Amino acid sequence: MNLRIILTVAALLAGTGAATANCYEGLGCDDSQYFTTQALQQGTCQQLWEVRNMIYQQNGYCFQTNRAKQSFSNDGCYINDQASVRLNVYERKNVATIQSVEKAKGCK
């Protein structure tokens, strides 16, 4: 199963309001395993953006940009300030690693 299919399924599940972690083949579960730079480098900029924002969505973040609002529902969100989103140690590290790979790839 490729990352795109897993992201699509995860996006559908995220809209259910369930506060659960997303797990990705080749990466692991975003709230209990560290993603590796090597594994993340296999993804596209779009996939990296989606995985990173899924972490914020599952933790209650209300997206501000039109792109994110169109990709992720703000239904059930309750945190407007991204800095106030409580991420566990795995999620924080995974977001940082994703951002590092996005930067190295020149993602916008």
Name every feature range the model reports, one short phrase each.
Residues M1-L7:
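Bacterial N-terminal signal peptides that target proteins for export
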Residues G15-A18:
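N-terminal signal peptide c-region/cleavage motif recognized by signal peptidases
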Residues T8-L12:
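Hydrophobic helical h-region of N-terminal Sec-dependent signal peptides
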Residues L27-T37, C77-Q82:
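Acidic/histidine-rich, surface-exposed loop or edge segments in extracytoplasmic proteins
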Residues F63-K108:
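Compact alpha-helical subdomains of small soluble proteins
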Residues A39-S73, C77-Y78:
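Amphipathic alpha-helical packing elements
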